[in-house]
Regions:
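Short, conserved secondary-structure transition motifs
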Residues: 173-185, 331, 486-489, 511-519
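ATP-dependent helicase/translocase motor core
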Residues: 2-294, 303-319, 335-339, 345, ...
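Signature of the SF2 helicase/ATPase Hel1-core->accessory helical subdomain module
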Residues: 149, 196, 345-451, 459
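Conserved C-terminal RecA-like helicase domain
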Residues: 338, 453-543
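Short glycine-/polar-rich loops that comprise or flank the Walker A/P-loop
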Residues: 135-137, 168-172, 291-293, 338, ...
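Short secondary-structure boundary/capping segments
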Residues: 146, 154-158, 186-195, 282-283, ...
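Conserved RecA-like helicase motor-core motifs
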Residues: 25-27, 266, 294-296, 309, ...
């Protein structure tokens, strides 16, 4: 690996940013920082000031602004950054001061500085600082090539303890780089190094090198959009979260589709990739579009309905309205609620029963965007058809980690047939490469040619193979592996086979709904009386 000094990396980054139309400003100490902030804030609020016959803020007015900004926790300051401040002037006027333009994110003032010295418990100099409207919102810490990247992360953690204060509490993002590896993360000191992310392009190719990262991630409009739209203020933990690149691109694809066409689409993101956060941000940003009347986030089970509501509330309190029953859903649809969480069962009842459908007939032609939690086979039946027939102007998007293709379409229907084209992919190979999910070892076993899963001989052969390799594949025979089967009746049959082959083996059963099961649960045997009547006694033995 070639060596490059930290100073050379810093100079190169600043040169790149200046070529990207960043203004360089020399800020030696905090007094310079405040003076520059006043000038930039006046530039950013020029129109508001001119409406009141002014060109700037008086000294006492700027002091009011500083007092307002410097109060509160880091989380509260992140909220202030995104709000307007009502500045009451001495002559009785009120000026609404904007610190960040979130709607037209390119229309902010971008500057870069370096080696700003700050006095805290210790005197510290920060490598490269990006200022937006005069506020330090992005801090970049560099290490020379060859130095472990985590050293830059650890240095930022030390800054949290020794020097970050005042306007530096408004930092939204950190960037760390040693030239060949570059990562970004939200200003959340408690999150840990595992929540630092590599930026990528839309097809998940990483931009590790600092120069490439700067050109794409630090481009002014992209950075303004990420800060303004793609940082989540997590109400539950009172912390900042930033979306990963694949989440960003997925939401952008949905927004583009809603704004520029009536076509549907689906997002193929592997399990464990943060689907709830992605869907929340998609629902939130789509709901802000002027021509969208409502956004419905549709899940397949009541327990998921409750869980999703809880998670959405943690992201932003009051952002969504949940529906405990069909009556409540109809009321929400009649109200001004912009984001509604419901189940496909409640939605089907609302459009199928005249008592309900007559109440929501007025909005059936409205611009409604539906985001489905999982594009599985429950959307291939009559319920989905009824919903889409009623809301004839609806646009639908689905999330899935297991799309249905022609090759695995049991009933002939595919995800593309129902939801349209795939808008973005983030597959398990990408997640393993990013260390977002654990890797795994695949070991193939080729048995006999019988392909019928219910065939008794095949099931016995599988059971014997597992028992023969039991000691090799487990740790002291403890519970450390899962054997997944497609239905409860099949589980009972396997239980009997295992017990007949080895009466001493311990077996525990976990019952769950499959991601791609049919709505009436015929595949699992969970929704009918079959399991209760024939299997409950045998299942009790598995406890």
């Amino acid at each position: 690996m070639s060596t490059q000094s930290e100073a050379a990396l810093e100079a190169g980054l600043i040169a790149t940013l200046r070529q990207m139309d960043y203004d360089y400003v020399q800020i030696v100490e905090e007094d310079n920082l405040y003076a520059n902030f006043k000038r930039q804030l006046e530039i950013h609020n020029r129109k508001r000031l001119e409406e009141h016959g002014r060109t700037g803020f008086a000294a006492e007015e700027f002091e009011k602004i500083l007092i307002y900004l410097e109060g509160g926790t880091r989380f509260e300051k992140a909220k202030k950054l995104r709000d307007l401040y009502p500045l009451d002037t001495a002559d009785g006027q009120r000026i609404w001061v904007e610190f960040l333009n979130r709607q037209q994110w390119c229309q902010n003032e971008f500057q870069v500085s370096n080696q700003i010295t700050v006095e805290g418990r210790k005197k510290c100099r920060y490598d490269v600082t990006i200022l937006v409207n005069g506020l330090p919102l992005v801090q970049i810490e560099l290490k020379r090539r060859g130095v472990e990247l985590k050293q830059a992360y650890n240095q930022i953690q030390r800054y949290h303890k020794t020097s970050f204060h005042g306007l530096f509490d408004y930092i939204q993002l950190f960037v760390i780089s040693n030239g060949v590896n570059t990562r970004y993360f939200a200003n959340n000191p408690n999150s840990g190094y595992k929540f630092t992310f590599t930026w990528t392009d839309a097809v998940n190719h990483p931009f590790n090198e600092l120069d490439k990262f700067a050109v794409f991630f630090l481009e002014k409009c992209t950075l303004g959009k990420i800060i303004g739209k793609y940082i989540v203020l997590h109400e539950g933990d009172k912390c900042l979260m930033v979306l990963r690149p694949y989440q960003f691109y997925a939401v952008e694809k949905i927004l583009d589709r809603v704004q520029n066409s009536n076509d549907n689409g689906y997002i193929w993101h592997t399990t464990g990739a943060g689907k709830t956060l992605t869907s929340f941000k998609a629902a939130q940003l789509v709901s802000e579009l002027d021509d969208v009347d409502k956004v419905m986030f549709v899940v397949d089970r009541h327990d998921l309905d409750t869980q999703t509501q809880s998670e959405y509330e943690a992201f932003e309190s009051g952002a969504v309205d949940s529906t405990d029953n069909t009556d409540e859903l109809v009321k929400r649809l009649q109200s001004n609620s912009k984001i509604i969480i419901t189940t496909i069962q409640k939605l089907n009842a609302a459009v199928s029963k005249t008592w309900y459908s007559s109440k929501i007939d007025a909005i059936r032609h409205s611009r409604i965007v539906m985001i489905f939690d999982e594009c599985h086979r429950s959307h291939f039946g009559d319920s989905h058809k009824k919903i889409m027939k009623f809301f004839d102007n609806a646009q639908i998007f689905g999330f899935t980690g297991t799309p249905i293709f022609t090759e695995n379409a049991v009933d002939g229907h595919t995800t593309k047939e129902i939801f349209g084209n795939c808008l973005h992919k983030y597959l398990i190979k990408d997640a393993i490469a990013d260390e977002n999910v654990l890797g795994f070892l695949v070991e193939y076993y080729h048995g006999n040619e019988i392909v019928d899963n219910d065939n008794q001989a095949r099931m016995e052969e599988i059971a014997r193979f597992i028992l023969n390799n039991f000691n090799k594949s487990t740790f002291d025979g403890e519970f450390d592996a899962l054997f997944a089967v497609q239905s409860v009746p099949m589980l009972i049959r396997y239980y009997k086979i295992f017990k007949s082959l080895n009466p001493k083996i311990r077996i525990g059963a976990v019952f769950t709904y499959a991601a791609n099961n049919s709505q009436d649960d015929e595949q699992t045997g969970m929704g009918t009386g079959q399991y209760a009547k024939e299997s409950v006694g045998e299942a009790d033995e598995l406890q």
